[in-house]
Amino acid sequence: MYSPAWVKDAIFYQIFPDRFCRSERYKAVGKFVPWGSKPTRENMFGGNLAGIEDKLEYIKGLGVNAIYLCPIFKSNSNHRYHTVDYFEIDPVLGTLEDFDRLVKKVHKLGMRIILDGVFNHCSRGFFQFNSLMELGPNSPYVDWFHVKGWPLNAYSGKPNYECWWNFPALPKFNTNCADVREYLFSVAEYWTRRGIDGWRLDVPNEIDDDSFWQEFRRRVKEINPEAYIVGEIWDAPERWLQGDQFDGVMNYVFRKAVMQYLFDENAISTEEFCKRLQAAFPEGRGDMPMNLLGSHDTTRLKSQPCTSWERIKFALTLMFFMPGAPCVYYGEELGMLGGKDPDNRRSVPWEKLPEMQKEPVYTLVKELTAMRNGNPVLRDGKMEIACDGESFTVTRTLGKKKMTLAVSLAENEPQFEIR
């Protein structure tokens, strides 16, 4: 299968917009909690697109060359996975002009930017769903959702319509409806034409229809053949990687193996880890995964059970050594703490930046981005894993060039070297 050429050279940085940076250049109407407050599922910090633009030089300075933005469309939630309007930037974040300026500056700095597409479900505030609540079965949008009874029970008791994981705030689209499909495809086309470099697709497996994603791919690639389409798939991804749907997946299979080997009290063996590592990067598949150790859905590295500096150091080094595009979750380079959602979505303490840049992980991330950017073998080379008891090697080979990560467990702490 073909993946966009630029992705093999990409190092992604994931941003949760509400918590990244709040610039005073943009004044949103509304009341926000003080920056640095404890995150909850409901509170809003007021991070904005201008704040992201203000920090692009910082991001570029890490050695990163691609940004993955969590949802930015109009929504009534801090994470914005409850979409109200797919064609409008959330006014808390900024304006369409702010978005265009951000994309332009990202590209001027030689970086790429992909957006989060939430196409399985929307918000109760979505216009067409509101029409059903007002007009019932007489709504012209009655076929847009999976309704089981009238009137809609959207705010009390058990919902009588299909919704994501039975959350009434997230009504599920009926993607068998031609009008729904066309609407969602037009969303993808609109933002692709505005200059983004691809899509991260939220829970795409919930749209259990290959033809939907095949058409999605065709529409996006017709506008930008080099757009990167990456799906949030937590388990075996082969179905989605036949060359006609996604270019890659978020490599949660890799992440799970690393967590169970390094950060679990009941750790798997080195032999089992090597098997799982190989399974996460099968030879000959040809896709371009997004490799990650943390995201807005997971506990941060520094807050994991059994965490230690040596384990974090090895985990990050391994991620940058593997095929695919590594992705750093915002603040991971600063050693930010964070347990389960919503604690893993804390605001970046920019006022403490000089102090936090002294964290060894900050230096490590810059060293790893430099290593990957400076060695084509880590971006294009074939991979081989060899296991011997409690030791193993990962070797990348490109022509006559070879790099090897040699690892052993000494007193349960990973010891490794690159040669």
Task: Give the predicted meaning of each segment.
Residues 11-14, 67-69, 113-115, 199, ...:
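Hydrophobic faces of well-ordered beta-strands that scaffold small-molecule active sites
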Residues 3-9, 23-45, 240, 257, ...:
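Loop/helix patches that line or flank the sugar-binding groove of alpha-linked glycan CAZymes
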Residues 36-50, 82-96, 166-181, 197-207, ...:
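The substrate-binding groove and active-site-proximal loops of carbohydrate-active enzymes
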Residues 4, 8, 28-32, 78-90, ...:
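Aromatic- and acidic-residue-enriched segments that line the glycan-binding/catalytic groove
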Residues 1-115, 120-122, 127-131, 166:
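N-terminal structural segment of carbohydrate-active enzymes
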Residues 103-109, 121, 126, 130-137, ...:
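Active-site-proximal helices and loops of the catalytic beta/alpha 8
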Residues 123, 127-194, 202-204:
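Active-site-adjacent "subsite" loops/lids of carbohydrate-active enzymes
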Residues 15, 59, 69, 86, ...:
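Conserved, mostly hydrophobic/aromatic
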